[in-house]
């Protein structure tokens, strides 16, 4: 794509001339249903994700020092909460027809923060799945002390890698003035370098989707084989939810990279971009919904009780030797994330 091309990241809502615009009567109609459709979705994600992740973060924060597994859920809930809190900021350019109101600094910072939280959530989920797998398989070297240290290191590594994945967003973003219709856009400009764009897309696809997907699917598959006699609906829901939310987003990135400039394929992909981004954002409210649904027996008592159930299920063997004997303390009984 050319200098004014946009990538599949947040805040990019530029139009191509893939549909007629009638300005003969002095009123240009530039409202595209596909571009305003994400607004109700963003509202639903915000209303569900903010209180849900806030509750999980609050409960996890209270017990994180005593329970190693709570650290995972604390970091995961914080990442998802920050992502959900950013939705009103993300919705404003959509509601204003693609006009960016936050200036040049906001153009570089705000989309990068959103990307940071989303990638951190994905990488933390993959690392948590690996931790659960280690606990279930029970390697001798994975003791409680080593696990506590390993969890802290893994959380830091997940945030660091997520930060590195967002660096191109901050480097290559700029404001672009359009004149028809008149609006200021926040776009990603690779300066016409297709090699740079291809490299960024490939790295994000591998480290932001394919790698975590393989890790999550492999670890939960191993857990299924390890305890084949029990039903594992939540583990399946985690893998399916991850794939459904993130696969379209990264496939769209590949399409935007390989599509020819001014092609019909590129135009359709850009029109669908806000809705597909919304689907990826929906993953930020998925985990609390899964906790509450599969912990609905405890939810009848109270909302914090359901969160405590999710935390207890993430502890595994470091809680007690009796954990393997009790279904209420069995890590693999529901493979909570």
From Swiss-Prot:
The modification Phosphoserine is found at residue 320. GO terms for biological process: chemotaxis; complement receptor mediated signaling pathway; inflammatory response; negative regulation of interleukin-6 production; negative regulation of neutrophil chemotaxis; negative regulation of tumor necrosis factor production; phospholipase C-activating G protein-coupled receptor signaling pathway; positive regulation of cytosolic calcium ion concentration. Frontal cortex, hippocampus, hypothalamus, pons and liver. The chain crosses the membrane at residues 39-61, 73-95, 115-137, 150-172, 203-225, 238-260, 275-294. It is found in: Cell membrane. InterPro entries: Anphylx_rcpt_C3a/C5a1-2, Formyl_rcpt-rel, GPCR_Rhodpsn, GPCR_Rhodpsn_7TM. Disulfide bonds join 107-186. The keyword Cell membrane applies. Keywords: Cell membrane, Disulfide bond, G-protein coupled receptor, Glycoprotein, Membrane, Phosphoprotein, Receptor, Transducer, Transmembrane, Transmembrane helix. Its main location: membrane. One of its GO terms (molecular function) is complement component C5a receptor activity. It comes from the Eukaryota. Residues 62-72, 138-149, 226-237, 295-337 are cytoplasmic. One of its GO terms (cellular component) is basal plasma membrane. Glycans are attached at residue 3. Residues 1-38, 96-114, 173-202, 261-274 are extracellular. The keyword Protein biosynthesis does not apply. It is a multi-pass membrane protein. SUPFAM superfamilies: Family A G protein-coupled receptor-like. Belongs to the G-protein coupled receptor 1 family. Interacts with C3 (the anaphylatoxin peptide C3a and the adipogenic hormone ASP); the interaction occurs with higher affinity for ASP, enhancing the phosphorylation and activation of GPR77, recruitment of ARRB2 to the cell surface and endocytosis of GRP77. Receptor for the chemotactic and inflammatory C3a, C4a and C5a anaphylatoxin peptides and also for their dearginated forms ASP/C3adesArg, C4adesArg and C5adesArg respectively. Couples weakly to G(i)-mediated signaling pathways. This is C5a anaphylatoxin chemotactic receptor 2. The gene is C5AR2.
């Amino acid at each position: 794509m050319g200098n004014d091309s946009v990538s599949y990241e947040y805040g990019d809502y530029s139009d191509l001339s893939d549909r007629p615009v009638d300005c003969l009567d002095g009123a240009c109609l530039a409202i595209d249903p596909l571009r305003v459709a994400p607004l109700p979705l963003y509202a639903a994600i915000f209303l569900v994700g903010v209180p849900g992740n806030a509750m999980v973060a609050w409960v996890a924060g209270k017990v994180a020092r005593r329970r190693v597994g709570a650290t995972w859920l604390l970091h995961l809930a914080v990442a998802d909460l920050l992502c959900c809190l950013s939705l009103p900021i993300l919705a404003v350019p959509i509601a204003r027809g693609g006009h960016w109101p936050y200036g040049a600094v906001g153009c570089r910072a705000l989309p990068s923060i959103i990307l940071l939280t989303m990638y951190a959530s994905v990488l933390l989920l993959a690392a948590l799945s690996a931790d659960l797998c280690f606990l279930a398989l029970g390697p001798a070297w994975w003791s409680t002390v080593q696990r506590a240290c390993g969890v802290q290191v893994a959380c830091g590594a997940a945030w660091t890698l997520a930060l590195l994945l967002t660096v191109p967003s901050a480097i290559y973003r700029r404001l672009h003035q359009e004149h028809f219709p008149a609006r200021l856009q926040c776009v990603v400009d690779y300066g016409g370098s297709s090699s740079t764009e291809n490299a960024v897309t490939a790295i994000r696809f591998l480290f932001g989707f394919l790698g975590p997907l393989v890790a999550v699917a492999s670890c939960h598959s191993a857990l299924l084989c390890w305890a084949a006699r029990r039903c594992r609906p939540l583990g399946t829901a985690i893998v399916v939810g991850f794939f459904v939310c993130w696969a379209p987003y990264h496939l769209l990135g590949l399409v935007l990279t390989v599509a020819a400039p001014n092609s019909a394929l590129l135009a359709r992909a850009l029109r669908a971009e806000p809705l597909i981004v919304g689907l990826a954002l929906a993953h930020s409210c998925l985990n609390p919904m899964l906790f509450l649904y599969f912990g609905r027996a405890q939810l009848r008592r109270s909302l914090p009780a359901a969160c405590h159930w999710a935390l207890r299920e993430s502890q595994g063997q470091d809680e007690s030797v009796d954990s393997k004997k009790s279904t209420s303390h069995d890590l693999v009984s529901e493979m909570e994330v």
